[in-house]
Amino acid sequence: MNYTTQMDAAKKGIVTKEMEIVAKKENMNVKDLMELVSKGKVAIPANKNHKSLDPEGIGQGLRTKINVNLGISKDCYNIDMELEKVQKAIDMKAEAIMDLSCFGKTEEFRKRLIDMSPAIIGTVPIYDAVGFYDKELKDITSEEFLKVAEKHAENGADFLTIHVGMNRKTAATFKKNPRRMNIVSRGGSLLYAWMELNNKENPFYEGFNKLLDICEKYDVTLSLGDACRPGCIEDSTDASQIEELIALGELTKRAWERNVQVIIEGPGHMTLDEIETNMKIEKKLCHGAPFYVLGPIVTDIAPGYDHITSAIGGAIAATHGADFLCYVTPAEHLRLPNLDDMKEGIIATKIAAHAADLAKGVKGARDWDNAMAKARRDLDWERMFELSIDEEKARRYREESKAKSKDSCTMCGKMCAVRNMNRVTEGKDLNMLRDDD
């Protein structure tokens, strides 16, 4: 193999098997895709050690992809349950899964996840550091943090989320500009704490060249984390968030010089009117790199319904440039999600992604909706169920309602507009009063 990474291959004019697969999925010319990869506008996360991967592209002109978060925690240390969630995410065709495990020895779960998953796998190495070394956070050395990142890359993680932009300059900006919610990024808060406790620079920022060595070796995509993402609408688009984004733009160029693919992570909580501006700022400051957003969550008052607040924000964000949506479940801010929460979160996020693809004019996006419109016009219930984003729920609602006619539902009965327009255009009587037709 005469290339190191997908980006290196693209710059050399080499079409990889991963590019061929992605181009076919996206209904696009593989040479056009290769050009986007060479410029960093599209990333194809594909670790050389992830043998079960069914690759996907993330970025400009492609379908909006979604990510599912899962992982073991101290309060819910159940590997079998988390593996059930993995299977659920795979069955529901999530393009990516992030292992956010944050307690104990996580390698067993991570390796099993990567072995079984055709989806892109992402991890956050700093979550693993305390358990990896059985050390207090402040006692972990800079070199040890990098070794954890290398272990995750060696295991086969396709992208690593690392909050490199939380450097001393960003930290100083944060201190000068108090926030209502401080730092709500788990990884960002851990790095900030380590820096404060040790009076040192961010080990990933200081050792960025070594981090790039790791990414280049395994063809790991670097997902530059947003330590200063807003945790409430009052903190959005503030000095800390923008200062960090400027740093991420500079780091992006350094990574691309080494042929390391980059994804930029983004907010967070913000009101509807700020979303479009934030998408444009990221694309400008980070040179068109793919943008990966959590939500955005558009109001802070809906615990139990944050899959909805997130889907609203995600649809707007993806319409205006976000390429990758992290799902949010009804359990957000309340507990570790269960399987039912997962399903709700995946469905809501897939709806947001598809709605944005329609608005962006992504090739082929309208085909699904047009097929549903035809099935509805034809009153073809079976086809409607097959096309539904949640087939099980659609079937259940229909079966529970016990409509008297196969041509209608319990909402309108024989006053169904579709039924009556079909009949009248065919020259048939409406037969509104008889039950036998």
Swiss-Prot record:
Cofactor(s), by name: [4Fe-4S] cluster
EC number: 4.1.99.17
Annotated positions binding substrate: 69, 98, 127, 163, 185-187, 226-229, 265, 292
Binding site for Zn(2+): 269, 333
GO MF annotation: an example: zinc ion binding
Cross-referenced InterPro entries: ThiC (IPR037509), ThiC/Bza_core_dom (IPR038521), ThiC/BzaA/B (IPR002817)
Swiss-Prot/TrEMBL GO biological process terms: thiamine biosynthetic process; thiamine diphosphate biosynthetic process
Gene3D superfamilies assigned to the protein according to its UniProt record, in alphabetical order: 6.10.250.620, Radical SAM ThiC family, central domain
Cofactor: binding comment: Binds 1 [4Fe-4S] cluster per subunit. The cluster is coordinated with 3 cysteines and an exchangeable S-adenosyl-L-methionine.
Catalytic reactions on record: 5-amino-1-(5-phospho-beta-D-ribosyl)imidazole + S-adenosyl-L-methionine = 4-amino-2-methyl-5-(phosphooxymethyl)pyrimidine + CO + 5'-deoxyadenosine + formate + L-methionine + 3 H(+)
Positions annotated to bind [4Fe-4S] cluster: 409, 412, 416
Alphabetical UniProt keywords: 4Fe-4S, Iron, Iron-sulfur, Lyase, Metal-binding, S-adenosyl-L-methionine, Thiamine biosynthesis, Zinc
Pathway, per record: Cofactor biosynthesis; thiamine diphosphate biosynthesis
Record Pfam families: ThiC_Rad_SAM
Annotated GO CC locations: cytosol
Function: Catalyzes the synthesis of the hydroxymethylpyrimidine phosphate (HMP-P) moiety of thiamine from aminoimidazole ribotide (AIR) in a radical S-adenosyl-L-methionine (SAM)-dependent reaction.
Family of the protein in this entry: Belongs to the ThiC family.
NCBIfam families: PRK13352.1, thiC
Protein's UniProt name: Phosphomethylpyrimidine synthase
Protein's organism: Clostridium botulinum (strain Langeland / NCTC 10281 / Type F)
